Amino acid sequence: MKLTRRHFIKINSVAAAGIGLGVTPVFASAVAPVFESQRPKLADRKFTSKAVEAIIKKVKADIKDPEVAWLFENCYPNTLDTTVNYSEKDGKPDTFVITGDINAMWMRDSSAQVWPYLPLIKNDPGLKKLIQGVLSRQAKCVIIDPYANAFNEGPTGSEWDSDRTTMKPELHERKWEIDSLCYPVRLAYNYWKISGDSNFFDDNWQKAGKIILATFKEQQRKDGKGPYFFQRKTETQSDTAPNRGYGNPVKPVGLICSIFRPSDDATIYPFLIPSNYFAVASLNQMAEMYSAIGHDNATADACKALAAEVQAALEQYAVGHHPQFGKVIPFEVDGYGNQLFMDDSNVPSLLALPYLDSVKVDDPLYQSTRKFVLSDSNPYYFKGTAAEGIGGPHVGIGYIWPMAIIMRGITSTDKAEIVQCIKWLKATHAGTGFMHESFNKDDAKDFTRKWFAWANTLFGELILKVHEHYPDILQQTF
């Protein structure tokens, strides 16, 4: 069976849920629930960080609700416990990060999975080296193929070798998604800002950065369709691209095409707006690094110029009028005037724009857009007896993604809304102690992907943010 992010197994019993992680879920006793750690045994963990362990101990002690404390203990270290493969090659750190139940490294997921550990690297040299290894591996991946979204650990080939695109043995999958090039920039930039260490910005990373810049320009499609195309023999419409693999037509207006979304689903209109916002932030971050670290003002200026061009195009073409919510940001556009009003659970999303430093959380346009995407006017916003939240076409109608509930909490400044998000997350882990890819809006035991490290670590990030900014919230039972 081919294991991709589209592949999922619906688990309808809590007992089965822990099998893939080597753990046994704990059920409530007749007296009181007992929450035993669902982490692997110490000897079986992929990587152990003293700084992470100290944070777990500290934050757990400040969480009144024992089940939420248990979820935090299980989820926050899940990436380190189960998905990282650290080594040294040619005397340099190298870290391969799998998604969880898929044995491949997504550029997006690998960046997001280690992101919440960045604030700790100044106090943990081992953790710092591990993230250096991620940066190094990602630069190599970009050089191999900037259009690929997921990579193998080595040149082993893939079950997707038959896709009609330019596959290479190092690639797991070759779906062009703008954010696959933005996430590594975000990780590198913030690693530099937090640690003060610029050694990662070597010849290899600078080469990768220039490839990112060139790829973004190429996918503005000012000079034709460009070299990328993708077709797959499939029964799932969103798993392949129309028009012989080049996607639906666009008018070159300065925006960047993304043939696939961060969900790995094909775009309808290739100017994917959340990802274009993300690209602007990434280009400005690259400009700063090329200038301050590399003293390469020519590349820095080129990055700034492209960022300004995309930003101007967003302001002109990525504002729409919704009959109920007024002026909002559309999810996708084509430059001809067509706009798609929706949001998806995967990040980048419209909901997540402040999280990615693309807009201010109090920006009026973002706030009106937020109200839209968190309403039933968004075709992928689902309300059920288990919870309510954003899903998407990747899994299907009626399935809410914990990631979207988490992101709603992270981007909220409303304590009541944050409390509600934590309540939903507590109520929908189906007794497993972990976040999942998605769950049925009316039955949380009907879920997909029992081992999805990004969602787990992101839950940890939510709790850390609440602990820092709204500690009183954690002094209640949810």
Enumerate the predicted regions with their spans:
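Low-complexity, Ser/Thr/Pro/Gly-enriched N-terminal "stalk/linker" regions
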Residues: 11-14, 30-108
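Extended, well-ordered alpha-helical scaffold segments
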Residues: 71, 125-141, 197-217, 286-317, ...
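Active-site-adjacent bridging/hinge elements
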Residues: 80-93, 156-164, 249-261, 431-437
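Aromatic-rich carbohydrate-recognition surfaces in CAZymes
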Residues: 103-131, 135-238, 453-467
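Extended ligand-binding clefts on enzyme/binding-domain cores
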Residues: 107, 142, 147, 154, ...
